[in-house]
A protein has these predicted regions:
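Conserved redox-cofactor binding core of oxidoreductases
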Residues: 1-80, 149-173
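FAD-dependent oxidoreductase catalytic-site/capping-region signature
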Residues: 1-36, 155-158, 173-368, 376-388
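Stable alpha-helical elements in mature extracytoplasmic
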Residues: 6, 10, 48-52, 108, ...
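Alpha-helix capping and helix-loop boundary segments enriched in small/acidic/polar residues
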Residues: 40-44, 115, 133, 364
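Glycine-rich nucleotide phosphate-binding loop and flanking beta-alpha elements
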Residues: 71-72, 107-109, 333, 358
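Glycine-rich loop(s) and the adjacent beta-strand/alpha-helix scaffold that form part
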Residues: 73, 78, 82-172
Length: 388
């Protein structure tokens, strides 16, 4: 693991601010600060495709089609018959012998369902899409972790900003990675994390920190030309709810994604408290020698309303969208799938991805989504065995 002096000091500062050091976030109570475990193998990111799909590519019962766009699920009455798709200029139909499984994520799965005529009639009819099955919850209940990216200038310490802003630094990082699979290019930006409560009334941690030895104005921009770090903090249990709605009957058109961050007083209060806590951490003795100076959002924001506005200015997705095909009872009008991940009111159609979460997890969503996939595969195999 790559070690940054600044991150070691920040962990000390978190402990001094009342967030205890821990060795493992997965011990049952994640409150505390520690260095993250990461999905990495020999200096290269590890993912579900490498861990699950690649070993299965040669199976005779698996065909993988790349560069193909799923357009809609074809329904035969209330039964899913398969998937209409396009690959290049060629249209095709993949018939389902047993069932169809959507795993396009919290944005893609509701989009495909709506294109198939499954969803809120008010969203489909204006686009000329016949309503095959009215299901009000499709695309609703969108949740995400909004990360508030506070940034601080520092002195007397190396950050990634200095290394990335010189040709020599870039060359050395690239060479180290190419030869040894070590160095900054082998690690995610956020190596240090923390879980804590925005105020003592919360029974468990409702904030998560991602601490990065770098800073930038927005994703895709170059790093700042001065040493700095980013303390990103997110509300783990937001009460705001958004939606995903298609804007066109054209499957190539991107849907409208409306997260509605900070839409509730509760979320705005947590955001203000989170920014205040981050400032308090920055004033701890462990960081004093680096003289941190807040420049995003800036020290002038002090009131709850001012801090909530600042949170909206510096906040951005942390790429954890969930909930748009939520699991629930058939009596719940907002529910899309049942406890076996089957779409309510339809046959031979399931959704197996992060969209089925009724509420977002109090932490990163990658591992929970893998667990949903594992559970989904168990359910499918069990039903196949019962059917003979």
């Amino acid at each position: 693991r790559l070690s940054w002096e600044l991150l070691v000091a920040y962990r000390e500062a978190m402990a001094q601010a009342g967030i205890p050091k821990v060795d493992d976030f997965n011990r049952g109570d994640n409150e505390g600060c520690a260095f993250f475990e990461v999905n990495q193998r020999r200096g290269v990111r590890w993912n579900a495709a490498k861990g699950f799909l690649r070993p299965a590519l040669n199976r005779p019962n698996l065909t993988v089609m790349t560069d193909a766009l799923a357009q809609r699920v074809r329904l035969d009455g209330r039964r899913a018959a398969g998937v209409e798709l396009v690959r290049g200029a060629d249209a095709a139909f993949a018939a389902a012998r047993i069932e169809t499984i959507l795993a396009a994520g919290a944005i893609g799965s509701p989009q495909i369902l709506q294109l198939s005529g499954v969803g809120p009639p008010a969203a489909l009819q204006p686009l000329g899409i016949p309503v095959a099955h009215a299901l009000a919850g499709v695309g609703e209940n969108l949740q995400d972790h909004l990360q508030l990216r506070m940034a601080f200038k520092v002195s007397n310490v190396l950050t990634l900003n200095q290394r990335a802003n010189s040709l020599w630094g870039k060359a050395m990082m690239g060479l180290e990675y190419a030869l040894f699979r070590t160095g900054p290019l082998t690690m995610p930006p956020s190596q240090l994390g923390g879980f804590t409560r925005s105020d003592p009334s919360h029974a468990t941690a409702n904030l998560e920190y991602h601490i990065q030895p770098l800073s930038l104005d927005k994703f895709g921009d170059p790093l700042h030309p001065f040493p700095a770090f980013t303390a990103s903090v997110c509300n783990l249990r937001p009460t705001s709810r958004g939606q995903v709605r298609i804007k066109s009957a054209d499957p190539r058109a991107h849907p409208a994604i409306m997260p509605r961050y900070l839409a509730t007083p509760e979320d705005r209060k947590v955001a203000a408290d989170a920014l205040r806590l981050t400032r308090r951490i920055a004033t701890q003795p462990a960081l004093a020698r680096y003289a941190p100076q807040e420049f995003k959002p800036g020290p002038d924001f002090r009131t709850d309303d001012g801090l909530a506005k600042a949170a909206g200015d510096i906040g951005t997705t942390i790429f954890h969208p969930v909930g748009t095909c939520k699991m629930g009872l058939a009596t719940d009008r907002a529910a899309v799938v049942d406890s076996r991940l089957r779409v309510h009111g339809l046959e031979r159609l399931r959704v197996v991805d992060a969209s089925i979460m009724p509420t977002i997890t109090s932490g990163n969503t990658n591992s929970p989504t893998l667990m949903i996939a594992e559970r989904g595969s168990d359910l499918i195999r069990a039903e196949r065995r019962r059917a003979g």
